[in-house]
């Protein structure tokens, strides 16, 4: 007699967790604050200098620090309690942003302050991403991640617009002070709304120079075939967000103005915001894993259709369909969490996020330069084509990862639970400690994943809602 399957997790279940509600609200405040600061500083620098180049440099200063933060600061969230890291990052950012509002601060100092404030976003995000599996175990984590990803996307779109409106209504310095208050509120929510947890890594993990620790993090992410494939699948977003980078020239070639540009941007944001929660709610964990590669390729193939030079209405459909296919990023995120050991997770997340931000900025610049030579539609189609080809290659790589490993003699490995793992262990990525190979001929190396299993047999991870 078999036990009845556990009911599927719901968004109501996710929001019923007080710690997640506090974390989610802090995400809204932090993301909105980041957008507001970028807009306010860009406006302030331009008002001071009347230089478009310096204004662009000031805006770019909000992205470049992710390189330093991702490589050298993200592992703080492994070596220190993650709640403490988040609260500290919010406090530091509040002070730095408030300092920007001081009258008479030189332009160079403003850019440096923004650079420093944004640099602390990386350890904050690494800590937030790493603590979430402990708050939302099993399949609840996938739903919670969908909520947070959608929130970030919405905050990016509305935050920039709200930032412009705030600067117009209140002025630059009051807007910066509002931004500082959002970070204070975020820190209070996390400090009061989440419980204390010890550091994930042992004290000895902090030994070594920052360069040595960064190199170890890169080896962790790119030395493992599964992690390497997952990170590259995540980085494919660089090709698929090109329409956002050249939305204005694309709309102009269609005879549209600011309204058409806004529609292009809104279509991608809205489609992603709708598709991601639906993908997490109605597609099973195992199916998500198998759909990652095909959906990534479908996103690129869809964008290739812009080579046909469609009108605005058809273009919006194309961009929406491509963005909806990008919901596969949720599966990438969840599989990444399962694969990375908990005591290295924050550093791994920092490196993965750093790559996305840096590559996306470079892709926007390259797409803009290419659009000076060929039509924007051709640039988008080329980016989609390249992304589709890479996605197909990564799909085959992922299938090799998913294939069951064979023991000597050709027999598939058999994994069984040695005992029921606690829910928090299941979510921490260390559940392999509770699994053993009953064939005993060969042991797999410690990987922190239950992805390798014999055909037709669910692992204990899958039975608990994790991929």
Show the residue positions of the predicted features:
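Long, low-complexity, intrinsically disordered segments
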Residues: 221, 431-467
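Alpha-helical transmembrane-bundle signature of multi-pass membrane transport and export proteins
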Residues: 1-438, 465
């Amino acid at each position: 007699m078999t036990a009845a399957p556990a009911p599927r997790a719901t968004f109501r279940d996710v929001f019923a967790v007080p710690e997640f509600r506090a974390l989610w609200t802090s995400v809204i405040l932090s993301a909105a604050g980041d957008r507001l600061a970028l807009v306010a500083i860009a406006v302030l620098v331009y008002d001071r200098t009347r230089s478009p180049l310096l204004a662009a440099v000031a805006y770019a200063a909000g992205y470049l620090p992710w390189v330093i933060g991702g490589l050298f600061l993200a592992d703080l969230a492994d070596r220190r309690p993650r709640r403490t890291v988040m609260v500290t990052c919010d406090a530091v950012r509040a002070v730095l942003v408030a300092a920007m509002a001081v009258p008479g601060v030189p332009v160079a100092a403003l850019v440096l302050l923004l650079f420093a404030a944004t640099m602390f976003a990386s350890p904050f995000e690494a800590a937030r991403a790493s603590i979430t599996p402990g708050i939302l175990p099993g399949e609840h984590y996938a739903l919670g991640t969908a909520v947070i990803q959608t929130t970030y996307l919405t905050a990016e779109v509305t935050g920039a617009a709200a930032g412009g409106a705030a600067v117009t209504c209140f002025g630059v310095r009051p807007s910066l002070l509002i931004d500082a208050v959002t970070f204070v509120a975020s820190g209070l929510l996390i400090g009061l709304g989440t419980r204390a947890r010890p550091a994930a890594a042992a004290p000895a993990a902090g030994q070594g120079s920052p360069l040595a620790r960064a190199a170890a993090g890169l080896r962790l992410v790119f030395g493992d075939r599964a992690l390497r494939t997952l990170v590259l699948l995540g980085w494919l977003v660089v090709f698929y967000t090109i329409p956002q980078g050249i939305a204005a020239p694309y709309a102009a070639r269609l005879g549209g103005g600011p309204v058409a540009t806004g529609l292009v941007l809104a279509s991608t944001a809205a489609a992603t915001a709708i598709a991601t929660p639906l993908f997490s709610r109605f597609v099973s964990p195992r199916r998500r894993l198998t759909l990652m590669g095909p959906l990534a390729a479908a996103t690129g193939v869809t964008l290739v259709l812009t080579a046909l030079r469609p009108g605005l209405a058809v273009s919006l459909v194309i961009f929406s369909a491509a963005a909806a296919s990008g919901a596969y990023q949720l599966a990438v995120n969840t599989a990444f969490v399962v694969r990375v050991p908990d005591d290295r997770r924050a550093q791994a997340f920092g490196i993965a996020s750093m790559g996305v931000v840096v590559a996306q900025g470079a892709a926007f610049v390259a797409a803009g330069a290419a659009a000076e030579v060929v039509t924007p539609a051709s640039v988008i189609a080329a980016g989609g084509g390249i992304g589709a080809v890479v996605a197909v290659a990564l799909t085959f790589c992922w299938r090799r990862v998913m294939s069951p490993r064979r023991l000597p003699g050709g027999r598939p490995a058999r994994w069984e639970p040695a005992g029921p793992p606690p829910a928090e262990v299941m979510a921490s990525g260390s559940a392999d400690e509770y699994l053993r190979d009953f064939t005993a001929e060969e042991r797999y190396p410690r990987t922190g994943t239950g992805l390798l299993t014999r055909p037709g047999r669910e692992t204990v991870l899958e039975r608990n809602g994790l991929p």
